[in-house]
Amino acid sequence: MELLKLNRSLPGPGPGAALCRPEGPLLNGSGAGNLSCEPPRIRGAGTRELELAVRITLYAAIFLMSVAGNVLIIVVLGLSRRLRTVTNAFLLSLAVSDLLLAVACMPFTLLPNLMGTFIFGTVVCKAVSYFMGVSVSVSTLSLVAIALERYSAICRPLQARVWQTRSHAARVIVATWMLSGLLMVPYPVYTAVQPAGPRVLQCMHRWPSARIRQTWSVLLLLLLFFVPGVVMAVAYGLISRELYLGLRFDGDSDCESQSQVGSQGGLPGGAGQGPAHPNGHCRSETRLAGEDGDGCYVQLPRSRPALEMSALTAPTPGPGSGPRPAQAKLLAKKRVVRMLLVIVVLFFLCWLPVYSANTWRAFDGPGAHRALSGAPISFIHLLSYASACVNPLVYCFMHRRFRQACLDTCARCCPRPPRARPRPLPDEDPPTPSIASLSRLSYTTISTLGPG
């Protein structure tokens, strides 16, 4: 992305100093421009120091939250067997791209701003520009893949059953990274370190012509913003409609009766029957083996003794005791879709100002520079980088099973030392077994003895 504000918005390399800078470029620079010295801004030292302190604090907070949060996501999704689903595979790729944005881009954007010059050389300049573009492209395409996967799983379950596997998700993720890598090749080709004044270097995009720069900006705006936005809006709109109709017209009893009629009429075991659909025919509840239906959680198979124990101890459902299984699955899907919608909305809110600024600068560089230089462009950059740290917060606040997986992972990494039980004194009576212990003893005895 044309986003690297490397030594662009600070007033200069010294108190009250004028900075010779190109008139054309704004975000990283993409045209040659004419060097002109701007008059120093008349601001107090206290205001300048406060702005610098706020900027450093915000950058540091976003950087730490992005690194810690996305590393936590990668570890939890990698270690938890219950979270190894198709949707979470794309969320894992999204976390890797956000981590790449934080580690490979943020330090090399902040430090040149503080120092007033770019000191890292041409190789780092090209690499930072390339990795930033790849990260944004992978994030966008991953969100599109998640939307299409959820649409297929919820609205087209029979067709999704054929290809909705983790191996297929892995192939899509690899294709996403390869496509993003190829799409962003122009960035390292047309990025270089250029002098912007006396002892001032800048990492800039230098396109062959203004027409090519405008074409590139419009192309990115269409491929990575408008088209993905329309696809995701349509997909989640259809998903919301399907879930709303499923919750409104819940026909478990109708489908059970239809399954019985179908089995009596020669269907093998009533295969493929599930909850009734509002259009009058039964809809199959097809999903991955072991998945509970929300797309972000896998129900691991339990051993036979555990199943027997759950059957013995499970309370008998009565009227009004809670939602039925099919309705509970729909509610779980609805919660996951709501979380994914929040992720999509936050992503586009964070990157909309950057796309708008880049397009404005491509067609009206001087006007964009006058309007956005200084605090506005600093806020735009901070907002775009904040997109790398919002997803972990969304997962923790809106994904109960992810929170539980985080706690389980922390408990596994930092186990508590076992507490020693106090031994009874010789004159004390032995402890009376609790009801739970008696239940386990009785169950073990029954299971061991077997029938008659």
Curated annotation (Swiss-Prot):
Disulfide-bond pairs as recorded: 125-203
GO terms under cellular component: plasma membrane
Disordered: annotated span: 256-285
Entry-linked SUPFAM superfamilies: Family A G protein-coupled receptor-like
Record topological domains on the Extracellular side: 1-57, 121-127, 193-218, 361-376
GO biological process: cellular response to hormone stimulus; G protein-coupled receptor signaling pathway
Keyword Cytoplasm (UniProt): no
Keyword terms of this UniProt record: Cell membrane, Disulfide bond, G-protein coupled receptor, Glycoprotein, Lipoprotein, Membrane, Palmitate, Receptor, Transducer, Transmembrane, Transmembrane helix
Subcellular location as annotated: Cell membrane
Keyword Disulfide bond in annotation: yes
Transmembrane segments: 58-78, 100-120, 128-148, 172-192, 219-239, 340-360, 377-397
Identification of the protein by name: Gastrin/cholecystokinin type B receptor
Protein encoded by which gene: CCKBR
